[in-house]
Curated annotation (Swiss-Prot):
GO molecular function: potassium channel inhibitor activity; toxin activity
Primary subcellular site in the record, as a coarse category: secreted
Superkingdom of the source species: Eukaryota
Keywords: Disulfide bond, Ion channel impairing toxin, Neurotoxin, Potassium channel impairing toxin, Secreted, Toxin, Voltage-gated potassium channel impairing toxin
Main function: Blocks Kv1.6/KCNA6 potassium channels.
Location relative to the cell: Secreted
Keyword Secreted assigned: yes
Pfam family, one: Toxin_32
InterPro entries: Toxin_32
Official protein name in the record: Tamulustoxin-2
Any GO CC annotation of this UniProt entry: extracellular region
Disulfide bond positions: 2-22, 7-31, 11-33
Originating organism: Hottentotta tamulus (Eastern Indian scorpion)
Length: 35
């Protein structure tokens, strides 16, 4: 499953086994997985 992680340079590095994109949230940026 996808999980939220703090977005840095590459979301894929932060969440191995998943793929996502950096999305701006109200409090900074988070990496959210796409289906």
């Amino acid at each position: 499953r996808c999980h939220f992680v703090i977005c840095t340079t590459d979301c894929r590095r932060n969440s191995p086994g998943t793929y996502g994109e950096c999305v701006k949230k109200e409090k900074g940026k988070e990496c959210v997985c796409k289906s």
